[in-house]
Amino acid sequence: MISGLFKLSNKQSVLQNATKLVLQRRTFFNIVPNPSVGLTEDQKQFQSMALDFAQEKMKPFAEKWDKEEYFPRDVMREAAELGFGGIYVREDVGGSGLSRLDASIIIEALASADVSTTAFISIHNMCAGLIDIYGTEEQRKKFLPSLVSMEKIASYCLTEPGSGSDAGSLSTKATKDGDHYILNGSKAFISGGGDSEVYLVMVRTGAEKGPKGISCLLVEKDTPGLSFGKKEEKLGWNTQPTRALIFEDCRVPVGNLIGKEGQGFSIAMNALNGGRINIGACSLGGAQSCLVAARDHVKVRKQFNQPLEHFQAVQFKMADMATKLHASRIMIRNAAAMLDAKDPSAHVYIAMAKLFACDECFKVTDDSLQLFGGYGYLKDYPVERYLRDLRVHRILEGSDAVMRLIISRELSKDDH
């Protein structure tokens, strides 16, 4: 159902503004592969809404935001007015109540203009979705309305300085003391760190080593004992701040426990399943824009007295790029549909989709830069920004190696 997405008055203004964006939209869709192929009419409608928003509110400023490392919270709040702050949060607290497949379509469209900002919107949605699924009614009503509107934003906190891919070895400790937990430890590479008002933090509450002793706590920004490291300087994703979180005798109410004690690792992995689809969708959006840019460039750029598109090598390269992008999109959307259907093997197909899409979309972006020649290396053109932003997708939400591990473990089972 999509009523939550369209219930706000902003729907009409966005649809009215769509006329002036029609040429940009046609450019995005009038190419093989067409991102709207196979979608329902409802899905096409909110895909167009997301694309119009991206073209009008994000694309004209993305280069400036990247250069100045500006975190566009004002624009994200505008996105939330369209329902993009709680895409799969239930409607009773203001969410849009959409599926993970629907979310992937929206995220791809937004990322076509600005991968970095869209990736943070995805992370925020992941956090809101976890509270909606695992939180108590009291927690849902306390936290979700302000998160769905993006008046407050949320960050996901799993990685630590000493535990990346081996998430089950995390060491941030939460010791129970009456009606509070006392947290000590740190988290690394946290998107939104220092700016977000709400942090979903995976901590060790039990004595057991490994995943069984991990729990999930909601920590608010102004909690005494919580501090932040320096803002990291990064290759890409420059429109969102990244900092470490430091807990020093940080007292968090027991009432901020999400789910049950010991359930945190399961919650974290569930979050990553959705996050992997979203980050793959971000890769799709960036690669689609690069393919369009490369297609337009080879039509007008001439060498040896003819346009580049007349050379068979360029034609075949473009054909390969389009095929990689289309295959990636099919895999991401299939994985999202499996997650919606609660298919028990969804995590394996999600790993395949994330691995393939993030790798191949990065190659499409790199090939686009190559087709631009020296111009592609200049910041006058957006392809280099997409390339920098897409590179990290092969590391976060589970690296390429971790995806291969998940897939190979499933292949080695005898009970299929």
Swiss-Prot record:
Substrate binds at residues 165, 273-276, 409. FAD binds at residues 156-165, 189-191, 301, 311-312, 370-374, 399-401. Its cofactor is FAD. It is found in: Mitochondrion. InterPro entries: Acyl-CoA_DH_CS, Acyl-CoA_Oxase/DH_mid-dom, Acyl-CoA_Oxase/DH_mid-dom_sf, AcylCo_DH-like_C, AcylCo_DH/oxidase_C, AcylCoA_DH/ox_N, AcylCoA_DH/ox_N_sf, AcylCoA_DH/oxidase_NM_dom_sf. It catalyses: 2-methylpropanoyl-CoA + oxidized [electron-transfer flavoprotein] + H(+) = 2-methylpropenoyl-CoA + reduced [electron-transfer flavoprotein]; (2S)-2-methylbutanoyl-CoA + oxidized [electron-transfer flavoprotein] + H(+) = (2E)-2-methylbut-2-enoyl-CoA + reduced [electron-transfer flavoprotein]; propanoyl-CoA + oxidized [electron-transfer flavoprotein] + H(+) = acryloyl-CoA + reduced [electron-transfer flavoprotein]. It comes from the Eukaryota. One of its GO terms (biological process) is valine catabolic process. Belongs to the acyl-CoA dehydrogenase family. Homotetramer. This is Isobutyryl-CoA dehydrogenase, mitochondrial. It comes from Dictyostelium discoideum (Social amoeba).
